[in-house]
Swiss-Prot record:
Protein name, as recorded: UDP-N-acetylmuramoyl-L-alanyl-D-glutamate--L-lysine ligase
Keywords: ATP-binding, Cell cycle, Cell division, Cell shape, Cell wall biogenesis/degradation, Cytoplasm, Ligase, Nucleotide-binding, Peptidoglycan synthesis
Annotated gene: murE
Organism per entry: Streptococcus agalactiae serotype III (strain NEM316)
Sequence positions that bind UDP-N-acetyl-alpha-D-muramoyl-L-alanyl-D-glutamate: S43, T161, T162, S188, R196
Post-translational modification: Carboxylation is probably crucial for Mg(2+) binding and, consequently, for the gamma-phosphate positioning of ATP.
Subcellular locations according to the entry: Cytoplasm
GO molecular function: ATP binding; magnesium ion binding; UDP-N-acetylmuramoyl-L-alanyl-D-glutamate-L-lysine ligase activity
Organism taxonomic ancestry: Bacteria, Bacillati, Bacillota, Bacilli, Lactobacillales
Pfam families for the chain: Mur_ligase_C, Mur_ligase_M
The UniProt record lists the keyword ATP-binding: yes
Length: 484
């Protein structure tokens, strides 16, 4: 519940209030007592006591008309649509929605310890590590790209890396109702670009890495813009953990100089001194030897990042050790074995840098023929297509099958051809993803060989023309073709 007086107070304090406009009359205050028992940005979810946020580049007046027909009596907007109900006009609808939602749900962020991860890759894996560390002796909720849990028991698929602010604070409130003590979440650059976490301060923020990604017409116009929005997490955290090996580390180091911080990686006090496939040793604040199920040094680095963050939240080294040992992540370096002994690696690697690291791990263990099944999504991250080509060109013996991966409103054949145009040798294009995986499974001969299925991980859908069409998921499809 929230009153109109409280809403106006919030907006005025944030210098985000213009006026209330109704029948061409302007109001700075509203004398009538009005209380809202629901918030919505979806015109299909409206009742008479709902406050509606008219937001988005594609918003149309007919959506507002539909909401008014359903009983809407007030809305918030940057634009006066000339409707027959009062409008609260603001300078920034996204800022307004975040702060009003925060208050509506009784500031649940103050009742949870908040841990956030950002970075081009590794956010989900690091979040899972932190979740398992905290779970040993606490009650953490988690919002991740892969799965969300608000009670530690039931899990559901997330639609956005970071939810819309209204949904985010509703989820936090549910976690509080479920007596959760901590919230682990991923914070994307888009979350700051679209102000989904506006006004939110995290107890610990972690910056894992940065490389060019999410650059395109509907995302970030430049790498500078992408990097800037990533760094906003540092300014909005009470303590930070940063990878000292990341590109452009010096600017981040300077930015966090006066914030309590830990660095990890080479040239820092928290460093891996021994790395085996399923164990590693750390010097520094986390000094110990750790067992780990996820292979690859980059996963060990993600574990250190999560461990340092949890240490700042009061988690013991023993709980950190147990958490790392227990962590698995759906769609992250999942391994199957064909009857001929060849390995199938299913991984979410979905940009050039993560593909590069995935190939390095597989090539370290598999010395025979390696087949890569790969695609790129439509209508986003267009720079990935060239990046994939550049990485593939560094592996001349790699056999490549290009296929569909969430083509959305683009033609998957055109996407595959664009990737192929950046590759310096012939590749195979099989648009049907299951057919591509089936074909790859026929190309191995012995235990030294491997198939890498990259991009979708555990996602059991294909995004086609704005819809999530059913797809079994790469792991389930690969299981069908183990006989070789």
């Amino acid at each position: 519940m929230i009153t109109i007086d409280k809403i106006l107070e919030i907006l005025k304090n944030d210098h985000n209030f213009r006026e209330i406009l109704f029948h061409e009359h302007y109001y700075y205050n509203w004398t009538q007592n009005v209380t809202f028992n629901a918030l919505s940005y979806d015109s299909r979810q409206i009742s008479s006591d709902t406050l509606f946020f008219a937001k988005g580049a594609t918003f149309k007046k007919e959506y507002l008309d539909s909401a008014i027909t359903a009983g809407l009596s007030f809305y918030v907007s940057e634009i006066d649509y000339g409707a027959d109900i009062p409008v609260i006009l603001v300078n920034d609808i996204k800022k307004a929605m975040s702060l009003i939602s925060m208050s509506f749900y009784n500031n649940p962020q103050n009742k949870l310890k908040l841990l956030a991860f950002t970075g081009t890759k590794g956010k989900t894996t690091a979040a899972y590590f932190a979740y398992h560390m905290l779970k040993v002796n606490h009650r953490p909720a988690m919002l991740s790209t892969m799965n969300t849990t608000l009670d530690g028991k039931s899990f559901f698929k997330s639609h956005l890396t970071t939810p819309e602010s209204l949904d985010l604070f509703r989820m936090m409130a549910t976690a509080v109702e479920n007596q959760m003590t901590h919230l682990v979440m991923e914070v994307s650059s888009q979350a700051y670009l679209t102000k989904r976490v506006y006004g939110l301060t995290f107890d610990v923020g972690v910056f894992l890495n940065i490389s060019p990604d999410h650059i395109g017409p509907i995302e970030h116009p430049t790498f500078e813009d992408y990097f800037f929005h990533k760094r906003l997490l540092m300014e909005n955290s009470n303590a930070v953990v940063v990878n000292s090996q990341m590109d452009h580390f010096n600017i981040v180091k300077e930015q966090v100089e006066y914030i309590p911080h830990d660095f990890y990686g080479d040239y820092s006090e928290n460093v891996i001194t021994e790395s085996q496939a399923f164990s590693f040793h750390v010097k520094g604040k986390l000094e110990n030897t750790y067992d780990i199920k996820l292979i690859g040094k980059f996963n060990q680095e993600n574990a250190i990042a999560a461990g340092l963050a949890c240490l700042r939240l009061g988690v013991s080294i023993e709980d950190i050790k147990n958490g790392i040992a227990q962590t698995t992540v759906p769609g992250r370096m999942e391994v199957l074995t064909q009857t001929n002994g060849a390995k199938i690696f299913v991984d979410y690697a979905h940009n050039g840098d993560s593909l590069k690291k995935l190939l390095a791990v597989v090539e370290e263990h598999q010395k025979g023929d390696i087949i890569l099944v790969l695609g790129a999504p439509g209508n986003k991250g267009q720079s990935r297509r060239k990046d994939f080509g550049d990485v593939i060109n560094q592996h001349p013996n790699l056999q490549v099958i290009l296929t569909a991966d969430d083509p959305n409103f683009e033609d998957p054949l055109v996407i595959s051809q664009e990737i192929a145009s950046h590759i310096n040798r012939p590749v195979t294009i099989i648009i049907d993803r299951e057919e591509a995986i089936a074909n790859a499974s026929t190309l191995t001969n012995c235990k030294l060989d491997a198939i890498i299925i990259a991009g979708k991980g555990a996602d059991a859908y294909q995004i086609i023309k704005g819809n999530r069409d059913n797809y079994s998921g790469d792991l389930e499809v690969a299981k069908k073709y183990l006989k070789r």
